[in-house]
Amino acid sequence: MANLLKRWVESDKRELKRLGKIADKVESYADEFGALSDDELKAKTEEFKKRYQDGESLDDLLPEAFAVCREGAKRVLGLYPYHVQIIGGIVLHEGNIAEMKTGEGKTLTATMPVYLNAISGKGVHVVTVNEYLSERDATEMGELYTWLGLTVGLNLADKSPEEKRNAYNCDITYSTNSELGFDYLRDNMVVYKEDMVQRPLNFVIVDEVDSILIDEARTPLIISGQATGTTTLYTRTDRFAKTLTEDEDFKIDLESKTVSLTEDGIRKGEKYFGLKNLYDPDNMALNHHLDNALRANYIMLRDKDYVVRDGEVLIVDQFTGRIMDGRRYSDGLHQAIEAKEHVEIEEETKTMANITYQNFFRMYNKLSGMTGTAKTEREEFREIYNMEVVSIPTNKPIARVDKPDLLYPTLKSKFNAVVRDVKARHEKGQPVLVGTVAVETSELLSKMLDDEGIPHSVLNAKNHAREAEIVMNAGQRGAVTIATNMAGRGTDIKLGPGVRELGGLAVIGTERHESRRIDNQLRGRSGRQGDPGVTQFYLSLEDDLMLRFGSERIKNFLERMKVSDDDAVIQSKMISRQVESAQKRVEGNNYDTRKQVLQYDDVMRAQREVIYAQRQQVIMEEKSLKPIIMPMIERTVKHTVLMHTQGDKSEWNLQGILDFAVSAMVNEDTISLGDLVNKTPDEIVDYLMKRAEDIYAEKEKQLYDESQMLEFEKVVILRVVDSLWTDHIDEMDQLRQSIGLRGYGQLNPLVEYQQDGFRMFEQMVGAIEYDVTRLFLKAEIRQDIKR
């Protein structure tokens, strides 16, 4: 381990040395560009564009372009990027991750690579975690870009397609990650190319990159339509689940968050639902509902995983503690929770298009990101995204003190200690930020502080709008702020007058998060830009992380210490180490899950790319789709003839071919068995293809102008592809649910999924070609066709 660390430190040093040289080159232009007039400086943008068009690379232009942007920032924003910020900018331009501590000016750092890459005219996307930050940065940094002669667009969820298109056509576009993904999916569902909003994905800088590419990597973006589901099954399975007793009828595995029925539970189920065998393949739907009912009742906790508000079940984001409006658990889990909470059960929805953030962002030509904490996930960034994490040195040394964890026997004693600590600091005027993992913890603490008469602000999932404002004031003298993990992320906490002398901002963590990175983010709220500060985590044996992974060693350790008093406290390096190792285990589990999700999703990705490329080809076609449609018809005809002419001639099924021709190609009264007898299979194919050519020519006559014929061809293909592709997505989802069960038969589930998925894809392509043949050849032409 020590060797590995040494290698990292060495490679970091070498890398920083290389980057430092380029940064020196940028700084060498400072005097020359500083002497230019405003107009001369602005004219540089056009000069760079021309040089780029004439074949100079962005790497060649980097030193001058960065220097121009830097001088521009000084004149427009009154900010002048430091040496370390230039280094960060180069890292971003090279498609890697710049790890910069809180308050080191990530937003300003990004201006240089954004400016340089916008010169190519291919578009630069800057991604933030919420719309508030998108608007803020687009407005503030937008002043600089427009001054330098570039256009800036802001892409928000409520904008019209027209406004979105304009935003994407700008040199620089600010957006949230989800909106970019949804626009991509919607673009691949449109039927007219004029309705598309995005340009090809070129360069993206992701702010808080760990949050989006790692914490949310598994979150699929789903566009769905209504499907016909059965709500009665949800209520029945929910009623049954509520009759069961833990340990006797079912077992809970907290580590993997699963519930499984015991033999007794299975027998009860068979009796309750009147079945011989609960796990018979015919009862697949029932089992799926039953699994969900068990999870909803015994794993998903109200006010921790979700809240119920106005008769609606709303998901709480486990990483940020925010309510995720409009998001629903998929695969029927949401409906199961609705049944559990006795609120109205919404119909299940059918997925029309989906993609994960991992695969969406991997489609960019160049992907880069910034964050305060990425070191712990170095491996994952390298393996999955092929990005290096470079730690950028701080501009001033860090003066914050991180104290070892304090461990208490019970939750109650822990919270009492937290309140005592807050009270003592508040009395001398030191500002305190208390970080909590769950919404209910922040509410409990708030109540305890009220009882002590300590004024404070609470930031949690339920209070989006005032977040930034509260965070900005969290560093004022006497301020006490309680916040769930990531609330107000991206907004700096600046220290008010007189606070430095009191020791700066005190950050108190009320429990460790399962990810070290989130703990580090909380610590990083204090001690920005060399400010003083202190951080302290309080733990108890009853914390989630301890219950799930706290080893026997800690419990024995406490018994040996004869800790009986509730307020007894231990501050020990061993405890901190145990917690770290528990966190590493969880992180390992989470990484494995994400990697596995990606391997499965890669199967879908390959298929999605094929289908989307075909759709693009169809939508973009301007003359005729005959070169696409005729081969489809030919493959369908060949396949059908081959199927019916196996073996000896006496065994051929010519009637089958005739039935196909009548149902998919020609009118009944224009063909008979006599037309097929005494022909070889090849001759039958030729005969049917000749008929198809005739029908094609006939249709061209009916649709007197080319554009109408093209429109008709597009309607046919898009209708068929879209309908079969959405069915296929659903089937692949179901395959994935069931594939895990095959692991028992010594088969590798991933390989099985790849093989079955490929076979299903082939079948879908065959079905698309058959449906296109039938729709195209048999459709009655009316003059007014609409896609």
Swiss-Prot record:
Against Pfam families, the record matches this protein to: P-loop_SecA (PF21090), SecA_DEAD (PF07517), SecA_PP_bind (PF01043), SecA_SW (PF07516)
Gene Ontology molecular-function annotations: ATP binding; protein-exporting ATPase activity
Q: How does it sit in the membrane?
A: Peripheral membrane protein
Could you say which residues form the signal peptide?
none
Listed under GO biological process in this entry are: intracellular protein transmembrane transport; protein import; protein targeting; protein transport by the Sec complex
Q: GO cellular component terms?
A: cell envelope Sec protein transport complex; cytosol; plasma membrane
The main place the protein resides is: membrane
Q: Does the keyword Transport apply?
A: yes
Q: Which UniProt keywords apply?
A: ATP-binding, Cell membrane, Cytoplasm, Membrane, Nucleotide-binding, Protein transport, Translocase, Translocation, Transport
What enzyme class is recorded for this protein? translocase
List its EC numbers.
7.4.2.8
Q: Which reaction is catalysed here?
A: ATP + H2O + cellular proteinSide 1 = ADP + phosphate + cellular proteinSide 2
Compartments, record wording: Cell membrane; Cytoplasm
**Residues at which ATP binds:** Q85, G103, E104, G105, K106, T107, D492
The UniProt similarity line reads:
Belongs to the SecA family.
Role this protein plays: Part of the Sec protein translocase complex. Interacts with the SecYEG preprotein conducting channel. Has a central role in coupling the hydrolysis of ATP to the transfer of proteins into and across the cell membrane, serving as an ATP-driven molecular motor driving the stepwise translocation of polypeptide chains across the membrane.
> Could you tell me which HAMAP family the record lists for this protein?
SecA
PANTHER family tied to this protein: CHLOROPLAST PROTEIN-TRANSPORTING ATPASE, SECA INNER MEMBRANE COMPONENT OF SEC PROTEIN SECRETION SYSTEM
Assembly information from the UniProt record: Monomer and homodimer. Part of the essential Sec protein translocation apparatus which comprises SecA, SecYEG and auxiliary proteins SecDF. Other proteins may also be involved.
What's the protein here called? Protein translocase subunit SecA
Q: What species is given as this protein's source?
A: Ligilactobacillus salivarius (strain UCC118) (Lactobacillus salivarius)
Lineage of source species: Bacteria, Bacillati, Bacillota, Bacilli, Lactobacillales
Supply the gene name: secA
